[in-house]
């Protein structure tokens, strides 16, 4: 008899009550996400799997739920760990106490810096953690063919990465023009995922009905870019799962909930996409999505189903998503469903977090490759290189941004200028994107409205998805010094006023992530936020994440790259 058969015989013996279970959970109120009901039952667990629910009475170890709700652990359907600015090990330490035990992660941020080496690092760093990180192979590196990033991933690279047992699916297909135009390299990546039966993640920002039809025909089966109820309905009608996103900059749940009905609710799941560490610590991960949906009027059982079973089925996670025989013995204890505060977290029958804290430390972090610690390479440039000369200052394209949104508007406006040279100040600030991977010296400049700074500048090497150095400022001196300081850090973020650095945070790992602990990163983020008041910034929303998306030329409408101002809807560069 092989070991596999012996394991199943042991589980079957416990399931049929011929032998005691390894673990017995008693006095719990089970949340049944299949029927959206609650009932009292014991849970029998053997070898880390649930073997029965009902009137079981024998277990070698007994866990008393003390009348609390027993809930399946949550699943984040789409996340970029890099946006939390900590390593996978530290990320797990933050999410597990929140009741999130599975995350579908796409490391395309770091892949845009260092390609295959970056993905391999993320896969290895994600192993043997209490958080089950399902790592996807990035499909669109770069996000658009004209981008200046640090690496690319070809179909052959994707093939090699799929051979790694730590790789789960194909990451979000951001380059939708490549799909719609039948690009051979992109179609080969999709075909590989299909052949392996792996999930294929979508990114259908702004696509009309015809484009959605083609996108779904290609085999892409979920999307997290719906921002209105109408967009969500259009996706569900075509067979997509809609991942309702609530991150730091993109907060879409309130707009999307009206699309959820009793008839279609099984086609919705939750995601965070991009969420800063301070927001994860303060609000939570997809546990916050659940709480927000409940606060907005959704039935708690429905919200829990969306955050568990729906996500598990969307991503073909057959052993997750419910408290039922054959599933992993992972579960949460929750006292009050209306507030959904997680009291305790069990992973495969083991207590891993209680009262918001881990019960044991996360293992030592995986070593970071040297290339990822040396990723910022700027060509020499002078302050004069930040001069923006306009063809017509009385009617020039301007990026209109709204804090809390990653979608911008294209506007034609009259802006302050002297001899045709833009003069930043007031509501009109200067945006700069400086190429930082190959020291090409390319600098994109634009005018942006919507950042409430009266002086100074902020800069960062977090600029989706090519992650060049991006900065916005009210004057060229501050802008110049902010860019140089961040480059000198080897990547990171800075708040600058004139030539004075008010606060800074190094992000040495690819210019995106810190090698410090989550607690240290939290403190540095707090210092950055506090320093913003000296620029006249009074808003609660973190401007750095809003800034980071101003360089992403696959989300409407007007964005800036190192090569210039780009109209996403027209998919073309525009003159200023």
UniProtKB/Swiss-Prot annotation:
Cofactor(s) in the UniProt record: Mn(2+)
Top enzyme class: hydrolase
Source superkingdom: Bacteria
Keyword Hydrolase found: yes
Keyword set includes Magnesium: no
Molecular function GO labels: adenine deaminase activity
Keywords attached to this entry: Hydrolase, Manganese
Pfam families: Adenine_deam_C, Amidohydro_1
Reactions catalysed, as given in the entry: adenine + H2O + H(+) = hypoxanthine + NH4(+)
EC number: 3.5.4.2
GO biological process terms on file: adenine catabolic process
HAMAP family in the record: Adenine_deamin (MF_01518)
Family the entry assigns: Belongs to the metallo-dependent hydrolases superfamily. Adenine deaminase family.
The name this protein goes by in its record: Adenine deaminase 1
Gene: ade1
């Amino acid at each position: 008899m092989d070991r596999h058969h012996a394991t199943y015989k042991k589980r079957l013996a416990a399931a049929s009550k011929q032998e005691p279970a390894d673990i017995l959970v008693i006095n719990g109120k089970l949340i049944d996400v299949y029927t959206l009901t609650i009932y009292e039952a014991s849970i029998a667990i053997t070898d880390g799997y649930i073997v029965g629910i009902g009137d079981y009475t024998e277990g070698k170890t007994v866990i008393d739920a003390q009348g609390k709700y027993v809930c399946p652990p949550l699943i984040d359907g789409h996340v970029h760990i890099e946006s939390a600015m900590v390593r996978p090990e530290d990320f797990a330490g933050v999410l597990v106490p929140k009741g999130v035990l599975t995350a579908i992660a796409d490391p395309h941020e770091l892949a845009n810096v260092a390609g295959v080496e970056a993905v391999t690092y993320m896969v290895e760093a994600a192993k043997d953690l209490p958080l089950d990180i399902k790592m996807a192979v990035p499909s669109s590196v770069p996000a658009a063919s004209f981008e200046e990033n640090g690496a690319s991933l070809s179909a052959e690279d994707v093939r090699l990465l799929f051979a790694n047992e730590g790789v789960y699916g194909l990451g979000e297909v951001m380059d939708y023009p490549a799909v719609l135009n039948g690009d051979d390299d992109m179609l080969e990546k999709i075909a590989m995922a299909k052949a392996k039966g792996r999930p294929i993640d979508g990114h259908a920002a702004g696509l009309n009905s015809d484009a959605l039809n083609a996108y779904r025909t290609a085999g892409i089966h979920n999307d997290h870019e719906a921002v209105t109820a109408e967009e969500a309905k259009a996706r569900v009608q075509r067979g997509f799962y809609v991942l309702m996103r609530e991150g730091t900059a993109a907060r879409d749940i309130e707009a999307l909930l009206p699309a959820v009905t009793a008839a279609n609710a099984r086609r919705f799941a939750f995601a965070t996409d991009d969420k800063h560490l301070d927001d994860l610590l303060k609000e939570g991960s997809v546990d916050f999505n659940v709480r927000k949906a409940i606060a907005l009027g959704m039935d708690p059982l429905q919200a829990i189903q969306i955050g568990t079973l729906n996500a598990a089925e969307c991503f073909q996670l057959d052993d997750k998503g419910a408290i039922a025989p054959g599933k992993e013995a992972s579960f949460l204890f929750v006292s009050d469903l209306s507030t959904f505060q997680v009291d305790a977290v069990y992973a495969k029958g083991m207590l891993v977090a209680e009262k918001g804290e881990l019960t044991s430390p996360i293992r030592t972090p995986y070593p970071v490759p040297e290339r990822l610690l040396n990723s910022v390479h700027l060509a020499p440039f002078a302050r004069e290189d930040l001069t923006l000369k306009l063809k017509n200052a009385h009617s020039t394209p301007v990026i209109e941004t709204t804090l809390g949104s990653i979608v911008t508007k294209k506007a034609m406006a009259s802006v302050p200028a002297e001899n045709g040279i833009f003069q930043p100040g007031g509501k009109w600030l200067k945006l700069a994107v400086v190429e930082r991977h190959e020291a090409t010296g390319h600098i994109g400049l634009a005018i942006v409205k919507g950042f409430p700074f009266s002086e100074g500048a902020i800069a960062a090497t977090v600029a989706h998805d090519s992650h060049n150095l991006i900065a916005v400022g009210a004057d060229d001196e501050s802008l110049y010094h902010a860019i140089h300081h961040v480059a000198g850090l080897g990547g990171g973020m800075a708040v600058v006023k004139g030539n004075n650095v008010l606060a800074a945070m190094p992000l040495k790992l690819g210019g995106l992530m810190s090698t410090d602990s989550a607690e240290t990163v939290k403190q540095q983020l707090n210092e950055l936020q506090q320093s913003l008041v000296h620029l006249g910034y009074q808003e609660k929303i973190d401007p750095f994440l809003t800034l980071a998306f101003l360089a992403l030329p696959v989300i409407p409408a007007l964005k800036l790259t190192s090569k210039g101002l780009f109209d996403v809807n027209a998919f073309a560069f525009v003159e200023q």
